[in-house]
Amino acid sequence: MCHPEARRRRGTSQTQAKYFFARAYIDERSLAVFAARDDGGDEFRMNAIIACGGTGGHLFPGLAVAEVLRARGHQVLLFVSEKDVDALALKEHPEIPFEKLPTIGLPSPFSPAILGFVRRFNESFRRCRSIYRRFKPQVILGMGGFTSTAPVLAGKMRGVPTFIHESNAIPGKANKMTARLVRAVLLGFKECAPFFPKVKTEVTGTPIRTELQRLDCKDAREKLGLSADITTLLVMGGSQGASGINQAMIKSLPSLDGARLQVIHLTGTRDERLVADNYRRAKLPAFVAAFHHRMEELYSAADFAVARSGAASLAELAAFALPAILIPFPYAADDHQARNAEVFVKADAAILVKESEILDDALAQKILPFIEDHGRLQRMSQNAAKLSTRNAASAVVETMEKYTTAAV
């Protein structure tokens, strides 16, 4: 059934950096956009760089900020990674120009891969400097991850106001490296502030995309071919799927036999057919897809979720008042997904289950109480809604505007 809360909510130094040879390429489409900027009038307009990408957890909040900046009349250029996940998501936003940077994650200092990291970082740094000479940014925002490091450093050396956003409850390596270069560190969780004791911090929440607005629950279920009045579980593994969660659901299907439940399951590319076949054999109603571009449909149709606990996913779950069974990615840096999940557990908006604990039908034993106790489901939904920061993108933009001057 569509729970009551768902029905209510519709709605480096400059002297060391010699003049690099090799100029970066900017595609004609981007240059055409920038050439068309309106310099007339008294209203403040910024050229803004947002460095995001590499995972959906960096990219989607960056896109959300870009949407608000553009709505306020600012020019925006995204810096993203060369990963397929970025290209796939940006196909849905052809109006936002972007550049790809060849950065990779920071390997161990003793790994042979460190040489490749340095080469790619230098290439990204040179490309940023070339683009900045043309675009003349007035503000730069890094969303974390090593796609953001070179742009923030190049911006600092140019004297441009720079900011970083840390969505997680514990900061990543890239943001810890660049924090002292920026005007302010913007936070998704207040619990992260103690990690930046010598830097100004502001808690904004984690931005979510403007299209993520609640739809009518029954209409959303109808679009997915599901029944209007059956408790609906959303299973998702983040922007790249999660084989561990997929396998746990498959093992749990026999124990869910006879439960008044239907499932929306995003599998990622590799497991889509396998998962769909298992739902059919179990005769459990399900909408199964590798990915889905209209996530607002899925969130609106669901009563609760099984999910990873990346910061972007948690922000979206809270925006739709969805309580969750959270299974943190066990190999996340510094176990940050577990720290994120703990915030929601403390608020009684989620339960935390380690991936090592979802053996046999263990996941089913966590799912069944949500189906059987609607009072608990409603209470946890209300608690999840209290964690929502739907205005986070606007808060990020307002902070950027506050610290930034119009001087070019």
Stretch-by-stretch model annotation:
Residues 376-390:
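A short, well-ordered alpha-helix in the C-terminal region of glycosyltransferases
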Residues 84-94, 217-305, 338-342, 346, ...:
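Donor-nucleotide binding loops and adjacent catalytic segments primarily
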Residues 137-139, 292, 300-315, 322-323:
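Acidic donor-binding loop of glycosyltransferase active sites
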Residues 108-139:
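An amphipathic, basic-hydrophobic alpha-helix
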Residues 6-14, 18-19, 24-41:
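A cross-taxon signal for low-complexity, glycine/charged-rich
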Residues 47-53, 70-120, 271, 356:
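Conserved nucleotide-sugar phosphate-binding/catalytic loop shared by glycosyltransferases and other
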Residues 75, 96-97, 156-218:
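Active-site-proximal region of nucleotide-activated glycan assembly enzymes
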